[in-house]
């Protein structure tokens, strides 16, 4: 008991001296790690009063090695808790019960963290890293063990932006790496992945090199192939977002979404070229949504494996990601310079239209690039002064609304009718419009074109790109997103595209019939 009291006294005395240098302002708080600290941590209310009782929704923890971890702040039973991202910080620094942490507020929502052992002495972190104990392995969200060897490791200081590189140890000094549990053919870990036996064999992570299909601006994991329908979906998205570097396309497997330790392996060459050089928290965001997720990007100590884990499970859960869905990672940097990716989620459906999906009997429901809502009381219009997409039917109510608009316009030029769906308005990550073969071959010029869109009653003009598509159809991609947002288009709205014959350049006037608009 006396020993424990002296340990606490050391920590408190050290903390007091540290705070005395801060000009009388409360910038620090000190906590000793008690039981169950590994999953969450409560911030003292007295310290929170300095911030008016609240913190921002996320904070940044700067480790002794200069690595920045983004941790989510939540409220529970009148307590402010660090949760999502905290476990990754604990695991990375091998924090144990009775260790002490001193948090120093730097600016905004950023804190420097000093880690003290149970004796009140600062923990020293070498470049070679520290062997993990079994207790850490049990709570670690990653389904792999860390290599026990010295190795090349590059750290980047978040303050000075300087790089520190460790000396490479000779091969004879390297320990044996921990063997992974049985992995899938794409090199991703299985559901449990906790086998800690050692082996000289190369990990399957080292074989998980990316594939870039010829002429495509995206990367696939090794052993992954896309059906024609999937390729078409990805091509449409890539043409729309115009990425500076290839996007990463991952088809979700059981280990990515359903495993207790769900994670996502990033191909080695792709990750080493485009992801951070150090294990750290990164930011994921969905297109058009404000919410962010902060999974841990983890680099295996021998450099053979790269993965997302930890709060990756939260991303999967919150976005209802299922096995067979496609996640397309568009790498970018968000406000403040934090590294992250915008994730475009393309769902797998069970409709029997186009393209086999993986090894199951499921299909992507494209229907000329669309996922059409089910309608009742359907009849196909035969003789009409407008055209629709192939295989598209209108309800009697929709026909009546369309014909009222067509009659009021009295257009001499041809008209094309399109019912907005997920792929048209960005709900599934795409912003495209397909002009069906019959309309495209009869009225539209061949090859890639710039098309001007006008709106009745508005002076704005939108420039969009129109590109050829298989089957003699034409597709609007780049620029269509702005038209959708500016005109607040929603699913089941109807757009009538009126081709203007008296314009010097290719132009269409768009007439919108809102879903809830009454005749």
From Swiss-Prot:
UniProt keyword annotations, A-Z: DNA-binding, Nucleus, Repeat, Transcription, Transcription regulation
MF term (GO), any: DNA binding
Main location: nucleus
DNA-binding region: 26-119, 249-349, 416-516
Ranges for region Disordered: 138-218
Record's compositionally biased regions (Acidic residues): 189-209
InterPro entries for the chain: B3_DNA-bd, DNA-bd_pseudobarrel_sf, REM16-like
A cellular component annotation (GO) from this entry: nucleus
One Pfam family linked to the record: B3
Compartments, record wording: Nucleus
Family annotation (PANTHER family): B3 DOMAIN-CONTAINING PROTEIN OS03G0620500, B3 DOMAIN-CONTAINING PROTEIN OS11G0197600-RELATED
Name under which the protein is recorded: B3 domain-containing protein Os03g0620400
